[in-house]
C-alpha cells in the first residue's frame, strides 16, 4: 500500500494507508520510514490487529535449495489467503488459470499456516491419483514424513498433512464412508484442488 519514487534529490511517498493523513508526501532520506514503521502501516491498512493475526501474516514463504520462490501473482494469492484466514474467514476461493502454479500456491499457503501452528491438520483433496502422486513427489515433498496419501479407505491419524481423492473418502454405503473416521473438527484446513 506504500510506494516511493525518487528523482535523486528526494522521495515522493504514495501512501494508500493515509497513515500520515496525506496520500502523497515529499520526504528526505532522513525522514524515510523504517521497516518497522512500514510494517505498522501495512498491518493497519490490512486490518491486522491482534498478535496472532500478525504472526500468521508475517510468516515467511518456503524457499528450497533450488532457489524456487513464488511468482509475484502467487505471492499476492498466498498473502491474501493467509491474511483472510488470520482474520478468521472460513471460506476462500482462488481462481487461477491453467499452468499458473495452483498446487504450488496451495503448498505455500499450507506451509505458512502449518509452520505458524495456525492450522496443524490439513486435508488436500484432488480428483485423480496422478495429481495426488505428482503433488506428493513435487510441491508437497517438503512435508516428508508428516504427510500421507489416504488410499483404499485406510486412515492413519498420526499424520498432519493428508492427501486424498474426493471419491477415496466416500463409498456406496454411507455408513462405511472413510471420512466418517474423522471427527468433524479433525482438520483445521481443507483445500480442494481442481474444484470444478
PLM regions and their residue ranges:
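Short acidic low-complexity segments
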Residues: 148-156
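Walker B catalytic acidic pair
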Residues: 193-194
